[in-house]
Amino acid sequence: MQRLAKIAVLAASLVLAGCEIARTAEVANANDTARFLAGMQPSADSPLAPLTQDPAWQRHAQFFDSAFAQLEQRQLSRIVAWSQLHLAAPRPTMFYMFSGPDFLYADAFHSRASTYVLAALEPTGPIPDVMKLPAGGIGPLLYYVEHSLSSILSFSFFITKQMKVDLDAGEVSGTLPILYVFLARSGKTIRDVSLIWLDDKGTVHAANEPVPPNAPRGTRITFAASDGAERTLYYVSTDLSNSGLRSSGFLKFCEPLAPGDSLIKSASYLLHVGSFTVMRDWLLANSSTIIQDDSGIPLASYDRRKWRFFPFGRYEGPIDKFPGRYQERYAELFERSQPLDFGIGYRWRSSESNVLLSVRVAPDDMGQMESTAEPVPPSPPRRSRPRLPDMLEPPRYFWFPR
């Protein structure tokens, strides 16, 4: 009897092992993987389809359905409407520096772009392959994805220190899983994904070619929007400081795509400091429009003869994590701002958020250009600054512990 029991256990183990081998031998395409990670049903014939019966995935799907529905109502739909109203002639390319893997807001502000260039320090990571996860690995993977997105779903930005930890955990790591989720939840269909690197001339190479030390690495994703038109997303992991840009071909890669529309938000005020002047000057020279909050390019860096300024919302100064970044000229400019019905940036509440739309003036219009609201020279006496509160936590609707 004991011998029969041992044989039965051995047979069951072999069956389970065979199933695991069969599962890992299958490969899911990028679009199905993105939908699975986003809590959306993959195609019926996908090898990922059976995994959606896992209670962990079903809970994950319910959580993301709720979280993204709230985000769509609270912010994204309003940003899309704002953009369509105020960006009259969008360029084919949009640039989003210091973005992290934030395709979500790149798409909301610039849904009509055909090429997206996102750049930040965070590594791309390998192409996600859920089928290679060990048995029992689905739950931890989905927790990792949710935890990685917690701050941007709440505040509209990634918390850099937290992201460094989140993106280096688990079998599926890096920024690609997050880009996948945002593409799927934005209604996009992924057609192809490849890992790339850039040489010092800005030429794109496949990742399987020999990579020089410190070369910018990233990914190229082709996808279709709801209109069926093919679009391209580049995410490049690179150092955007002066020294980093001077030693890489990243800006040479960007130059043929310019001029474009630029987005800067929650950028840690890096463009205010001397070690990021190369990036700042490049954006000013190669952007047709710039949408930013006050953490982007300081107002004093704009040439008032070349730009028109359209302020929206309310400027209350930086949060207390960034002392010394208050701008008197910005405050004067926003005294004549238009209403803003969505929150963005470090002051994520709509009643405290600011958005500045800067539009480059055509050469023929220079000299007779009149700004909607001109920055005032720093002659008035210094006004008292508003209180700079700590960043407060938003409503908690995440199921995972904090």
Predicted regions and their residues:
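Short, thiol/selenol-centered motifs that function as redox-active sites or metal-ligating centers
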Residues: S99-S111, V117-A120, F155-Y180
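Bacterial N-terminal signal peptides that target proteins for export
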Residues: M1-V9
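Extended amphipathic alpha-helical interaction segments
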Residues: G139-G174, I190, S194-D200
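Short aromatic loop motif centered on NTY/YTY
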Residues: L167, D192-Y234
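Bacterial signal peptide processing site
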Residues: E20-I21
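Short, surface-exposed basic-aromatic patches at helix termini and helix-loop junctions that form
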Residues: A88, P177-K188, P210-V211, A225
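Bacterial N-terminal signal peptides
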Residues: A8-A17
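Non-globular targeting/processing and membrane-anchoring segments
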Residues: A25-S151, T222-A225, R231-R402
